[in-house]
Amino acid sequence: MRILGIDPGLRVTGFGVIDVSGHRLAYVASGVIRTPTADLATRLGTIFQGVSTLVREHAPDQAAIEQVFVNVNPQSTLLLGQARGAAICGLVSGGLPVAEYTALQLKQAVVGYGRATKSQMQEMVTRLLNLTGQPGSDAADALGMAICHAHSGSTLGAIGAIGGLAPALAKKGLRVRRGRLVR
């Protein structure tokens, strides 16, 4: 099963594509969609087109996207919601089912600790996917979103259905203890 994870943002939208087979996670692609300094409609169009292109190029079976959190600044929350909406439209226009997860669910599923830092997310994603280099924070969050969806058990045949991430970590000689990855 191929999963496309999206970390929405108005300026930078992260994406990550993984393949899931049993307890195995395999990296396919990751990166960011950068919007130009332009009016809101142009930026939202760039996000929609970018996500639509990813769906065509990578042919995922399912998608996962981060839910909007309520920020102190309501204007920022509204803009993030619009960026997220453009990304969801790109996913749905490609016929994908879309799952939504909170930042807390993402961090708990990937790192084992709901208040994990960006660097902890990057490190865990790097280890889980056997990457040679560490992805940027937006791409790492998007890859983490795909891993979270695989772990959720809501994907048929995904790693979350039987045993969660523990077997995948154990194969690498790793485990999570007090929110930290240890050997």
From Swiss-Prot:
Source domain of life: Bacteria
Subcellular localization(s) per the UniProt record: Cytoplasm
Pfam families: RuvC
Keywords: Cytoplasm, DNA damage, DNA recombination, DNA repair, DNA-binding, Endonuclease, Hydrolase, Magnesium, Metal-binding, Nuclease
CC per GO annotation: cytoplasm; Holliday junction resolvase complex
Needed cofactors: Mg(2+)
Major location (coarse): cytoplasm
Function recorded in the entry: The RuvA-RuvB-RuvC complex processes Holliday junction (HJ) DNA during genetic recombination and DNA repair. Endonuclease that resolves HJ intermediates. Cleaves cruciform DNA by making single-stranded nicks across the HJ at symmetrical positions within the homologous arms, yielding a 5'-phosphate and a 3'-hydroxyl group; requires a central core of homology in the junction. The consensus cleavage sequence is 5'-(A/T)TT(C/G)-3'. Cleavage occurs on the 3'-side of the TT dinucleotide at the point of strand exchange.
Assembly, per entry: Homodimer which binds Holliday junction (HJ) DNA. The HJ becomes 2-fold symmetrical on binding to RuvC with unstacked arms; it has a different conformation from HJ DNA in complex with RuvA. In the full resolvosome a probable DNA-RuvA(4)-RuvB(12)-RuvC(2) complex forms which resolves the HJ.
Protein name: Crossover junction endodeoxyribonuclease RuvC
Gene (UniProt): ruvC
